[in-house]
Swiss-Prot record:
Binding site for carbamoyl phosphate: 137-138, 188, 216, 219, 351-352
Sequence similarity: Belongs to the aspartate/ornithine carbamoyltransferase superfamily. ATCase family.
GO biological process: 'de novo' pyrimidine nucleobase biosynthetic process; 'de novo' UMP biosynthetic process; amino acid metabolic process
Record key words, sorted: Allosteric enzyme, Chloroplast, Plastid, Pyrimidine biosynthesis, Transferase, Transit peptide
Protein known as: Aspartate carbamoyltransferase 3, chloroplastic
Reaction it catalyzes: carbamoyl phosphate + L-aspartate = N-carbamoyl-L-aspartate + phosphate + H(+)
Amino acid sequence: MTASSSLFSCSMHMEVLTPKISKWPKDFVSCHSKISYVETNYLKSTCYPISRFLCINNLSKCDKMIKTRQRDGIHCFSEGQKFQLDDVIEAQQFDRDILNAIFEIARDMENIERNSPESQILKGYLMATLFYEPSTRTRLSFESAMRRLGGEVLTTENAREFSSAAKGETLEDTIRTVEGYSDLIVLRHFESGAARRAAAIAGIPIVNAGDGPGQHPSQALLDVYTIEREIGKLDGIKVGLVGDLANGRTVRSLAYLLAKYKDVKIYFVSPEVVKMKDDIKDYLTSKGVDWEESSDLVEVASECDVVYQTRIQKERFGERLDLYEKARGKFIVNQNILNAMQRHAVIMHPLPRLDEITVDVDADPRAAYFRQAKYGLYIRMALLKLLLVGW
């Protein structure tokens, strides 16, 4: 006998492991839901018979609105049902049903942020942000998201230098220690695969906030959400990924998510030394996604609904600064690119920006990158709510 959800499935004879469960306040009750699934390839196959807990007290007006939208069938997941993921590690974890449901909750979070500053959805929960690489938007948006939902934050600035990692402590030991202080860890690390290692030993949710040149799944979620809000659709779009495609984790995760949608075409525009890696191109081909490499940004911009610009990542070049200088400045979004773009199209950027988008572009309504950063708050509010209290 096999039970399944829209995202995962597992046979009942498979090994049953203890689910990750955080510390729960006494005024929480259990809502049972038979959900079984297999996680992605970085963790063992797991079956969970019990949902996460759902708070029943101190719901604000907007909190109650979320429950009403769920009862009205805005998305296909039941109120109180456990979120299908224990951790957010890579973009491949999400299917279209999950993405659509997350986006609906993100819209609810917009209402909470605007109309319900006293939300208590995550009251009693602690989130730890553990960042081994610099961050402004990702760290602050996660911390803002947690506090706007009534939760608390433990944070460390530059954990690579100012934590016990500087004394030689392993990532695994740090995770085991920090999980004793918190209910969820948001981790950024300089090594690809670090979030996967953390999730394998942690008993609480791990959110990958960027692992070296690997992935940045929450950024990809907010990017796709931004496209939906700005363009109005996700099927049938054309997206130009521009800049450092070899080292940029955001473009890798975004490519994985775009492959979930129909009739998407992706253009890769980059200097020769930072071209998109073959694993992404092979993945897109395997999913039937049309992609093309080009060196003509003007032509690509004229075709695309989205021009997604990225900076050349100097920190990934090590001592080969000659290669960095060779790549820098080759593809710049300026007035010439704006003139070539369609009127409905938008320019996106994960930020920070250096000189790859000229400042005069900011005044054009098609410059969506600061709106994109704001959408990230709502996506991260939605993720924290789902990981800690479920649908």
